[in-house]
């Protein structure tokens, strides 16, 4: 489980997002590409 908070150019308020697996996260991240302005991992997701 990967949990992050991210912001984009059009979404300056941090948004929490959960991913089942690191592969799912990597796919999402490459899909978002340059839209992402910040990504912070959140530890200890349950």
Swiss-Prot record:
Name-wise, this protein is Putative gene 54 protein
Coding gene?
54
Lineage, top-rank taxon, reads: Viruses
